[in-house]
Amino acid sequence: MTKKTNFANTFFASSIHNAIDKIMVELELIRRLANQHSGEKGREAEGILNGFLKTMLPNKWTVDTGFIINENNVSPQVDIIIHNQLEAPPIYSGYSHVIVPIHTVGCAFEVKMQLNSHLAYLKCQENAKIIKDMHTSSVNKKQQPLYIVFVYSANVDLGNLEIKLNNSEHRHIDCICIIEKGLIFLNSHKSKYFSFHASSLNEVNKKTILGYTIKEKHMVMIEFYAYLMHALQNIKTEVPDYHSWKDESLTELLNI
């Protein structure tokens, strides 16, 4: 009996395969053309992921770069912010940056071209804590926005990094995606990190019915995208309390 093809699964995997191939081609161009300008490489790296997310996420979610604000604080610059503009538009929208209320944020990304130090990943925990604390102090919803560290290349062992993260007292990063190695996820109880090694999967280096060969980076991106879509489905954003903001802002502006 001929095996029936699941077209949804086939085209889903093929779409991610094409997207990651496009990303890798663009990355190689960046490495060649911007070899002497690390700042430019970083911005281009953010732009590549930004483009992928804008193409692959539902229209409910808007993808921007900028700052997150609540009643009392403004975050440091966030590389990529996924926010629900249907709930509330940005408080400020400039040529390249926005300021969005924490109430509408679904995910914040820290994007790195390369990240090799365990200490650097632990530093990312501090950045994630800022966003999580802003949400806790301002939003009624229990489910916090995601914080993801997305890395294109890293000279670290995924297993050792998992151990370092679990030995730390911090549990603020939800996911670390390293395209060339795999992923590290925070479990649903927010108590422990566990790693996903693409090299351990049977599908790697096998040829598909569509003619292309599945590489480790394809499996990493398929897992990352599936995780992101599922997690965003469970995040409930809300409209900020504009009446309260109005009263407090007028009080401060008029120095009452």
Feature-to-residue mapping (PLM):
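Intrinsically disordered, low-complexity Ser/Thr/Pro/Gly-rich regulatory segments
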Residues: 1-77, 82-256
